């Protein structure tokens, strides 16, 4: 009999990942593979989105349960966000964007967990989601059956530390995050409770890109035939190092080269941050050498990676396990990145030019850009090694690794 597994997603963005989101994309991978392998009876909790619901209607082996957020809750969130940004002048005002929605979502999921009976429950990446277990007697009901999947460092426990400690296992996206989780847990942290599930991407999606797909994007971006491209992908947040990359790119002054910045501050919701406005000012000095695409649908990303001569992902914080790094390697592209957080567990020196973060980071990044863009044989070597490294990075292996870390012993059929 199939095990009944529930995944509780963030409640911020819908499943499948029609509005983007790294965690949402990983959940979608598990769904896609379960549709083929059908090893578990999978249920995923998500906030409602009409497009996502339409896609999920075709699933045969997975049920997505949507929590529809009332208009009054959405309006309340907009008011809270406006107050935090404009009156309180909060620097991290985006953390106030979905407070009411999350509380409503947690309540809805908690009530449904009480009605249902699952063999495994996986809480995805935010301590507040433990409210789904603490309420309605679910912590006792699912004791020994629930897991926490950590994609980031925990910055606050929101009163749920004991619920967190009672997890059957704490699954992390890198050893870096696993070590941080142990610090949160405390000195008594039992080693067997901590497990690592390395991130993956849909390798078919990222490797099956046609020349026509690439030409289409080059035309959209008005690139000349002799233009080479440095590509950055991701949210335009300060910790991603995009400002430093733009400054380094301007300083490097590489002939016939454009910097293509793919992404926006907060996915597809139209918000523009003060930081984005600052980036636009920096780009003015580069004239047409720096191109902003804005939000790009995730299904279009493989062509943009394929278009790149080099991908640069210069995180200046302890990035746990950025999917953008994994995507670039999976496509087989030369990579420039940093040795921050969990990045070195994915991007090793044989596939990437590693730039240490220091006071002279912009200068060091400038040198790295000139080195990689100026040496075609070096770029080809990095690309070949990336293709070899990613050969075993498959959606199927991610699915079976996921089953194993939640104590469902299934061997991958190769």
What is each PLM-predicted segment?
Residues 258-277:
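Glycosyltransferase donor-sugar binding loop
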Residues 371, 378-392, 404:
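A short, well-ordered alpha-helix in the C-terminal region of glycosyltransferases
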Residues 207-223:
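A short helix/loop element that forms part of the nucleotide-sugar donor recognition site in Leloir-type
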